[in-house]
Amino acid sequence: LNASNESVRTYLDKTYPGKTDKYLEYAKKAWPTHKRPSDLMDIDMRFRPGAVYQANVKSAVTGGAPVYMYLFDWQSPVLDGKYKSVHCMEIAFAFNTIQRTHNMTGGTKEAQKLADKVNLAWVNFAKTGNPNHKGLPKWPAYTEQNTSTMHFDNVCTVKPQLDKELIELVTGQ
């Protein structure tokens, strides 16, 4: 949470030898709102590249089901934001159980509003294969060409893939 610029560079040098400067450039371009040095260490490069790969492969299947990509960007206010948007944070929102998990979500009004949106998207997707509903911006199916991605946050937005260069750098593909 309180990592210095120097400790972040040391971590990145060990994790991505010879790629630190490009990593920082691409990460800041993809995530300009990340202000703390530690934010640059917390970018998901463990699960995200695989998710993008799967979305690209599955969306290319002729006659296959549409693919809907999302990122859960909402930041937990608990412990002065220590949790940020940890892996699996969206589960309580998808099942609309944020009050039961208030120790992680804070159980705020804003969190409840987002939980209602995320839950309905999951329900719609389970019922129809399409997560769209009137509480969200139009969410096009993902393709490798449009890279349409829903960003779940207090204000939900659809954007193209912002971290493509970073993923290519990290994976070497």
PLM features: what roles do these ranges have?
Residues 1-109:
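Substrate-gating cap/lid region and adjacent catalytic-acid/histidine neighborhood
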Residues 34, 46, 57-67, 75-78, ...:
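Alpha/beta-hydrolase-fold serine-hydrolase catalytic core, especially in secreted/extracellular enzymes
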